[in-house]
Swiss-Prot record:
Protein's organism: Xanthomonas oryzae pv. oryzae (strain MAFF 311018)
Subcellular location as annotated: Periplasm
Residues spanning the signal sequence: 1-39
Protein name: Periplasmic trehalase
NCBIfam families, sorted: PRK13270.1, PRK13271.1, PRK13272.1
Keyword Hydrolase: yes
Keywords carried by this UniProt record: Glycosidase, Hydrolase, Periplasm, Signal
Domain of life: Bacteria
Catalytic residues of the enzyme: D329, E511
Length: 568
């Protein structure tokens, strides 16, 4: 199939994953074939062929889907796409088309008769007198799901082992969330469950060729920040170095997914997740296979695209989807004017955090090769080194911090964000760059409640004034790696105090936090604040271990205990 230029410098390709591709000056043929080694078997089913991709709700019953979402039948656009059709979706849609014009037709009654509702994850039936650490230990069982078989027509994807969901509206496993959740599981001694989650992600790679955003059909067209190598590293800390070789095949497939399309991309062009800069350097961006509204946010996306007059709607949809893949949905980082979602251009941005994670993946692949010093180990290490050089050349702001790069306008962002600490977390920063980044962060992003996501207020949830548990951990861990103990402690203790304060008032942990003194949970975004909450639980346990005395023994303020009926 010939390449189709979707927009300036953006090449769409249907090519297979790279097998002999020039990446950062090295040929992939030097190490992909030699490194396809026999590894220890996974404790997961052997997958002989890719699983058929199930239709998404907007594909399975398009007219009914649009009627429900555009009619705002439910407050949350994700609610309906998680419903279980009780019979063949094609028949349901046909019945809708035959009946919807009839006098007295009731759309809500039609949906109720043909679908089973998926309730949110309930976490509020725990004793009210528990201390924070005990509360988290009691939360884990409430967040565990086991779905090795799902009913026909469900948007949920089956997984062979139990897994932990975030909580609230998030009834499925999420890729990057899970690393921070797994940190907490290991800290809680639940290493078997942590291993099972890692095996689930290996299964998804083997089954679909990548780890999707989450285990839903409507998430299959994209991934999320690539933390699989960090998960392998975490489990190796539990089981030993053999873990690296066990997951080598899946690490290679993960890398191939993110580098797919690099075979033919020319300087100044992009293909899928890959961008080749004018000097030949190859870095990565976020991207999505589809360029339609997200089913789980259909009305939000169509309204955003309708505000854009100078770009095709398909471009806007892909940028919205790519923003969802980034995990930062949404933020001023992706906005051309820094304020309005209608100016989103995620696919034009080379993010510092994504490329730091891929550096770690390359380093992990080098380590995972069977013999130290083998050709594949040297070649993956060389790729990591060349990515580091490209990051230093293009993503380092001389004002003293790492930033994102716009490959279309060839400009480096002047915005400082929490993502600037990812190079420290990945261990790629020089001592000088780490010191200067820490100094800039100390001046610009430290708040009474921890590390700010950005210094810009837009109303988007990944901007000021919100703080997010995963970014606190990336900061604390990265700063500690480079000897910035005082700043790490300041961020960690302040965020932990914020978590403890809200827990004392409301007896819950939430998805995001406001960072001002005595602030409530964070705001903004496309949905209400969620509690549970997987990654907050994991990071909180890590911080309690690092900085004991900051809420480790404190119990919440006394409250009137809800009855079980009220909790339900």
């Amino acid at each position: 199939m010939p390449h189709v230029v979707a927009r300036s410098g953006d090449v769409m390709s249907s090519a297979a994953p790279p097998s002999c591709t020039s990446l950062l000056g090295l040929s992939l043929s030097m190490f992909v074939a030699p490194c396809t080694l026999t590894a220890a078997p996974l404790d997961t089913p052997v997958v002989n062929a890719p699983a058929p991709t199930p239709p998404t709700p907007d594909q399975a019953y398009p007219e009914l889907f649009q009627a429900v979402q555009s009619g705002e039948l439910f407050d949350d656009q994700k609610h309906f796409v998680d419903f279980l059709p009780l019979r063949d979706p094609a028949l349901i849609n046909a019945d809708y088309l035959a009946q919807h014009d009839h006098p007295g037709f009731d759309l809500r009654k039609f949906v109720d008769a043909n679908f089973e509702e998926s309730p949110p994850v309930q976490t509020d039936a725990i004793r009210q007198d528990t201390a924070l650490r005990e509360h988290i230990d009691l939360l884990w069982p409430k967040l565990v799901r086991s779905q090795n078989h799902v009913p026909p027509y469900s948007s949920l994807l089956s997984l062979p082992h139990p897994y932990v969901v975030p909580g609230g509206r998030f009834r499925e496993v999420y890729y990057w969330d899970s690393y921070f959740t797994m940190l907490g599981l290991v800290k809680s001694g639940q290493t078997t469950l942590s291993r099972q989650m890692l095996d689930n992600f290996a299964y998804l790679i083997d089954t679909y060729g990548h780890i999707p955003n989450g285990n839903r059909s409507y998430y299959l067209s994209r991934s999320q920040p690539p933390f699989f190598s960090y998960m392998v590293e975490l489990q190796a800390g539990v089981e030993g170095q053999a873990v690296y070789q066990r997951y080598l095949p899946q690490l290679q497939k993960e890398y191939a997914y993110w580098m797919q399309g690099s075979d033919d991309v020319q300087p100044g062009q992009a293909a899928r997740h890959v961008v080749r800069l004018a000097d030949g350097s190859v870095l990565n961006r976020y991207w999505d296979e589809r360029d339609t509204p997200r089913p789980e946010a259909w009305l939000h996306d169509t309204r955003t695209a309708a505000e854009v007059k100078d770009r095709p709607a398909a471009e806007v949809y892909r940028d919205l989807r790519a923003g969802a893949e980034s995990g930062w949905d949404y933020t001023s980082r992706w906005l051309a004017d820094g304020q309005n979602l209608r100016t989103i251009r995620t696919t034009a941005i080379i993010p510092i955090d994504l490329n730091s994670l891929l550096y770690h993946l390359e380093r992990t692949l080098a380590q995972a090769c069977a013999q130290p010093g083998a050709a594949c180990s040297r070649d993956y290490a060389a790729l990591a080194q060349q990515r580091k050089q490209a990051i230093d050349a293009h993503l380092w702001n001389k004002a003293g911090y790492y930033a994102d790069y716009d490959w279309q306008t060839r400009t480096l962002s002047d915005q400082i964000t929490a993502a600037a600490l990812y190079p420290l977390f990945a261990g790629l920063a020089s001592d000088d760059h780490a010191k200067r980044t820490a100094s800039t962060v100390r001046r610009t992003l430290v708040r009474p409640g921890g590390l700010a996501t950005t210094a810009v207020k837009t109303g988007q949830q990944w901007d000021e004034p919100n703080g997010w548990a995963p970014l606190q951990w990336v900061a604390v861990d990265g700063l500690r790696r480079y000897g910035e103990q005082a700043l790490a402690r300041t961020i960690g203790e302040r965020f932990l105090a914020q978590v403890q304060a809200l827990f004392a008032r409301e007896h819950k942990l939430v998805e995001k936090y406001g960072l001002e003194t005595n602030a409530a949970g964070g705001g903004g975004g496309e949905y209400a604040l969620q509690d549970g909450f997987g990654w907050t639980n994991g990071v909180t346990l890590m911080l309690l271990n690092l900085y004991p005395g900051k809420g480790a023994k404190a119990a919440p303020a006394k409250r009137v205990r809800k009855t079980e009926a009220a909790a339900r």
